[in-house]
């Protein structure tokens, strides 16, 4: 048996990256060694268990060392293959743009391998297949993410399953304290998280901070879970009979994340799930997994017990394994319609609870009485922010009446936006995520031109000095678009604003409602009556009135509908708590022992 102390991961967090893995192993395992016992450092364990001792009923979450060793050994037992623990060493960062340190190593470095998190330990995958994580502004390889093996996936699910009984019985006040500490650690490490997101995903540093902050709000909301998870009680429903309902955790839950919000979407998922008492399997996007790994380490430092949160990486096979595994009770997904409907159908066929948030075509309706400057700024920010890679991006604008004066002003202001690497201080928008994404966006722009739309502003051929290899597309505006065009029917997911014209308010509402998507819609007007009509008549699930991106704060729920959502319960808010819990109803009666037995159906009528 090989004992490896797990390194405190402050070194990687200080540089905005994830923990380095065992790149050049000097220790090999003998063929008959099929078990690896991984012990966290005593310092880390002490921090993580300090909170458990504070439970109101003095519940002890710390198991004996022998029990911990036995359990972890069992979780990591894989016949013929060992889960390789991280070697306790810090590897110099490969590129200057990833580090906050002023000095960089001149030694050539191989990209680090992103670890899985299984049973409280970061372990290197034994997979033979890895995917490059690429900086979209430079095309440099940041790291390599594994296609997790089936044995490793099963070990992660087993760890979550075995952690569940103790975690669900942990006082809810203790679980809340973990979240309180977690939100504090996120705030302290926000700059490093933002740098990692900008490096891997491409969005500007300011936008990366927004990504983290919107997720942080969900963590803060989860700190009040004792109130959110309350049940209902009604005394004397019959003679001497009381009935109450309680909300209990489901068990092992899973989350499958997209590339466009590397911090926010994971924070929509696992903080709510684990604070309800569940354990969790997180699959980050293979394009930008670093933020999820950093967040997981912060969660463990905050006191989350081993096995409560696990991370597995991969693509289709990992997703299918999540859908098929009988021990996983619920799956939360954000991503494309193709993937979302596949996951919904496959997981639902296995009896799982599903929430699947998918594609969008969000419309902004502009009435002639709208405030000109405020509306133009809103359209630019919502259409081109994050290079248009938001599920709530305002990608389509419908002008009622004259459109030309609005379009001319839009073009003028869009030309002033700075397109460059997201880490540059003056960047307004960065690159799109990949070369394939850029090619698809450019194809849809050209399809609009071919179908008769007018290209008012073309950002396809932009070249950014110093970042010539980047996946950059400048702000692009198409005018005269009609509902039958592919550029309108498809979600472009890039910095492209599609402009349409309607002769009347009612016609504009009809155009919006005929679109298959229903994530969000916004109106820009000075008329309260028009705003109220819009609110009542529009079928989209989230409405903005002079608000371009109406994403609700977490005490409400994210409520996309139509083709933008599949499932019965939405993300966060009350619906999110309901999704990660199940209702148990208890009917009780305390009275003297009866002298006779009645076989009649019980009713509320006095017998």
Swiss-Prot record:
InterPro entries: Ald_DH/histidinol_DH (IPR016161), Ald_DH_C (IPR016163), Ald_DH_CS_CYS (IPR016160), Ald_DH_N (IPR016162), Aldehyde_DH_dom (IPR015590), MeMal-semiAld_DH (IPR010061). The keyword Transit peptide applies. The record marks 260 as: Transition state stabilizer. Keywords: Mitochondrion, NAD, Oxidoreductase, Transit peptide. GO terms for cellular component: cytosol; mitochondrion. Residues 9-30 have a biased composition (Polar residues). GO terms for molecular function: copper ion binding; methylmalonate-semialdehyde dehydrogenase (acylating, NAD) activity. The active site is at residue 391. It holds the Pfam family Aldedh. PROSITE patterns: ALDEHYDE_DEHYDR_CYS. Residues 42-51 have a biased composition (Basic residues). It comes from the Eukaryota. Signal peptide: none annotated. It is found in: Mitochondrion. Residues 1-98 form a transit peptide. It catalyses: 2-methyl-3-oxopropanoate + NAD(+) + CoA + H2O = propanoyl-CoA + hydrogencarbonate + NADH + H(+). Belongs to the aldehyde dehydrogenase family. NCBIfam families: MMSDH. This is Methylmalonate-semialdehyde dehydrogenase [acylating], mitochondrial. The gene is ALDH6B2.
């Amino acid at each position: 048996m090989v004992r490896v102390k797990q390194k405190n991961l402050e070194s990687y967090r200080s540089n905005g990256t994830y923990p380095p893995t065992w790149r050049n192993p000097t220790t090999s395992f003998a063929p008959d060694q099929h078990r690896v016992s991984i012990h966290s450092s005593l310092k880390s364990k002490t921090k993580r268990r300090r909170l458990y001792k504070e439970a109101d009923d003095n519940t002890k979450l710390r198991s004996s060392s022998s029990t911990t060793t036995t359990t972890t050994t069992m979780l990591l037992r894989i016949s013929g293959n060992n889960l390789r623990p991280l070697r306790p060493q810090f590897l110099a960062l490969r590129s200057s743009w990833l580090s906050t340190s002023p000095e960089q190593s001149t030694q050539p470095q191989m990209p680090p391998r992103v670890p899985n998190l299984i049973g409280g330990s970061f372990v290197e995958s034994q997979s033979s297949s890895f995917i490059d994580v690429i900086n979209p502004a430079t095309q440099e390889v940041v790291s390599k993410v594994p296609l997790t093996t089936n044995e490793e996936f099963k070990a992660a699910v087993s760890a979550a399953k075995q952690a569940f009984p103790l975690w669900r019985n942990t006082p809810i006040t203790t679980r809340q304290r973990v979240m309180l500490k977690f939100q504090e650690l996120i705030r302290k490490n926000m700059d490093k998280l933002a740098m990692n997101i900008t490096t891997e995903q491409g969005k500007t540093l300011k936008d990366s901070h927004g990504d983290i902050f919107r997720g942080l709000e969900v963590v803060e909301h989860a700190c009040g879970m004792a109130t959110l998870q309350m049940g209902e009680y009604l005394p004397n429903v019959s003679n001497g009979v009381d009935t109450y309902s309680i909300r209990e955790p489901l068990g092992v839950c899973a989350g499958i994340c997209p590339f466009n919000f590397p911090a926010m979407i994971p924070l929509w998922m696992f903080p709510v799930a684990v604070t309800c008492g569940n354990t969790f399997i997180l699959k980050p996007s293979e394009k930008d997994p670093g933020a999820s790994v950093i967040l997981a380490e912060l969660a463990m430092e905050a006191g989350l017990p081993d096995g409560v949160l696990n991370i597995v990486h991969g693509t289709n096979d990992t997703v299918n394994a999540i859908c098929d595994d009988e021990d996983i009770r619920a799956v939360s997904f954000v991503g494309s319609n193709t993937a979302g409907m596949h996951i919904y159908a496959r997981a639902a066929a296995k009896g799982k609870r599903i929430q699947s948030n998918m594609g969008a075509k969000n419309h902004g309706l502009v009435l002639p009485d709208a405030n000109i400057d405020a509306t133009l700024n809103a359209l630019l920010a919502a259409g081109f922010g994050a290079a248009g890679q938001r599920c709530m991006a305002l990608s389509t604008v419908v002008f009622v009446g004259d459109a030309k004066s609005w379009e001319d002003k839009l073009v003028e202001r869009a030309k002033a936006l700075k397109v460059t690497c997201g880490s540059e201080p003056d960047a307004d928008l960065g690159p799109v995520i990949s070369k394939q994404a850029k090619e698809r966006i450019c194809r849809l722009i050209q399809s609009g031109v071919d179908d008769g739309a007018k290209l008012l502003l073309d950002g396809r051929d932009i070249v950014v000095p110093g970042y010539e290899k980047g996946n950059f597309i400048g702000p692009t505006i198409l005018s005269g678009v009609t509902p039958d065009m592919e550029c309108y029917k498809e979600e472009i997911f890039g910095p492209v604003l599609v402009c349409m014209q309607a002769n009347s308010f009612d016609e504009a509402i009809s155009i919006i409602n005929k679109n298959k998507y229903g994530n969000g819609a916004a109106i820009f007007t000075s008329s309260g009556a028009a705003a109220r009509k819009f609110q009542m008549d529009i079928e989209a699930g989230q409405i903005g009135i002079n608000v371009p991106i109406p994403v609700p704060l977490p005490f409400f729920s994210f409520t996309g509908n139509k083709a933008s959502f599949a499932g019965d319960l939405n993300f966060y808010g009350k619906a999110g708590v309901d999704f990660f819990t199940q209702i148990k109803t208890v009917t009780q009666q305390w009275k003297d022992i009866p002298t006779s037995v009645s076989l009649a159906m019980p009713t509320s009528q006095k017998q």
